[in-house]
Amino acid sequence: VAEQAMILPVDPDPLLITTSKGDVRLDVEVTDTQVEHARGLMFRPPLPQGRGMLFVMGEEELQVFWMRNTPSPLDLIFAAKDGSIVSIKQGEPLSEAQIPSDKPAKYVLEVAQGEAARLGIQPGDRMRHRLIQP
């Protein structure tokens, strides 16, 4: 039996990131359960520009992700409880190497690799969304 990709609806509220260049708007799918966190973008084709997956984790703590069964390279953007970005890491396709946040994070945004640089997103920038409660 072939594994199936998890496709979630795009949240009606965009995620905004305030950067030095201004606000960036992304349409996101939101994962907020352990089952959804475990599946993430596994078996999915590459995300288009302007799209992402927002992981709402249970606690603000050091987060560790991996790219198992994820065929597309990603930028992983880790943010604290207040939405401030604490680190940005790159994930390589299908790798089981651990990708840790540098500091405690409550939110993780996955976008296509290169999107963070293209959009000017850097540590210290702030993510805003109805689910991010500072």
Please provide the spans of the model-predicted regions.
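Compact, glycine-rich, soluble single-domain proteins
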Residues: 2-134
